[in-house]
Design a protein with these regions (language model features):
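Single conserved hydrophobic/aromatic residue that forms the stacking wall/gate
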Residues: 1-11
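Acidic/histidine-rich catalytic neighborhood
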Residues: 30-73, 111-135, 139-147
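Alpha-helical transition-metal enzyme core signature, strongest for iron centers
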Residues: 5, 47-58, 90-97, 130, ...
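Alpha-helix capping/hinge segments and adjacent helical runs
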Residues: 80-156, 244-269
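Glycine-rich cofactor-pocket loops
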Residues: 12-48, 63-80, 162-168, 182-199, ...
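Short amphipathic alpha-helical segments with heptad-repeat character
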Residues: 45-48, 84, 91, 171
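C-terminal amphipathic alpha-helical interaction region
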Residues: 147, 163-275
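Structured alpha-helical bundle/scaffold domains in large eukaryotic membrane-trafficking regulators
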Residues: 21, 25, 56-66, 102-105, ...
Length: 275
């Protein structure tokens, strides 16, 4: 459902941006559609790259689940690790994607005529049912990371490191994630502290996995383009989405992991502090 919300919204907002005339984009003629505006392009690319990353995560996780179903022990462990990311990270991003869809429409997006607001309302319930994202984050922190001393997390990080060794941006984020994981394990006995940063830990790891899978898609698209001109536009769009993710989305990991390593103390307040 998260994926379908995102995909439907991306296609509808792109269609609108290609036909809506408003303002004069820089270096464009009067009467150019709003897709000519730089920030509209940014919003559309953000929607597309995030949705493609979510879709990739769900597809890869489906394969892991099938292997787990027939008793593959490594897949069983990885399935458990990925589920809270699917539920937590993806549903948070669904809200962002649908909110961007409203933004592209401007004031028209806020009313019912365009349908953009309905997508946003539908996405808002996603982080609540099937367990709120706070529950998913605590599950990811305590049961899927701390309980096995980071075994599954470390294995996945090593796989990403090897697979993306030629991608400088992802390699840097793998190193940062490893550092963050070690910090969490060093503080494993302070459960109150870890509960204050579990959401950011989940989000940061989700963005890393998304970047890894987008890089896989980019490499596959480049390979196919070198072999044939078939589906050229589609393959080039995959490459653009992956490059956008590298430079616009991947840096979010630094934000989330800085919160993990520096931000718990300010949240560990007494109830009186909120009065």
């Amino acid at each position: 459902r998260t994926k379908s919300r995102g995909l439907g919204d991306v296609y509808k907002r792109q269609e609108y941006a290609n036909t809506r005339i408003q303002g004069i984009p820089i270096n464009r003629e009067k009467g150019t559609a709003i897709i000519g505006h730089g920030d509209v392009k940014r919003l559309l690319l953000s929607m597309r790259s995030l949705t493609e990353a979510m879709r990739a995560l769900i597809l890869v996780s489906s394969e892991v689940m099938e292997k787990a179903h027939v008793g593959d022990n490594k897949s069983i462990m990885r399935e458990g690790f990925l589920i809270p990311i699917i539920k937590g990270w993806s549903t948070e991003l669904a809200q962002e994607v649908t909110s961007n869809g409203v933004q592209i429409h401007g004031g028209m997006g806020f009313i019912e005529e365009t349908g953009a607001a309905q997508y946003m309302r539908d996405a808002r319930i996603l982080p609540i049912y099937e367990g709120t994202n706070a529950i998913q984050a605590n599950d990811f922190m305590f049961r899927k990371t701390v309980r096995d001393n980071g075994k599954v997390a470390k294995e996945l990080l090593e796989e990403i490191k090897i697979d993306c060794e030629d991608n400088i941006e992802i390699s840097e984020m793998v190193n940062l994630t490893t550092k963050t994981l070690n910090y969490i394990l060093e503080n494993r006995d302070d459960q109150e502290m870890l509960s204050c940063i579990s959401f950011d830990y989940l989000m940061g790891f989700g963005y890393l996995i998304g970047g890894w899978l987008m890089d896989k898609a980019k490499r596959s698209a480049n390979k196919k383009l070198s072999e044939s001109s078939k589906n050229e536009m589609f393959l080039k769009s995959k490459i653009i989405s992956a490059e956008f993710y590298d430079f616009h989305i991947l840096p979010r990991i630094e934000y989330h992991f800085k919160v993990v390593m520096k931000g718990a103390k300010v949240v560990q307040l007494t109830n009186d502090s909120f009065i």
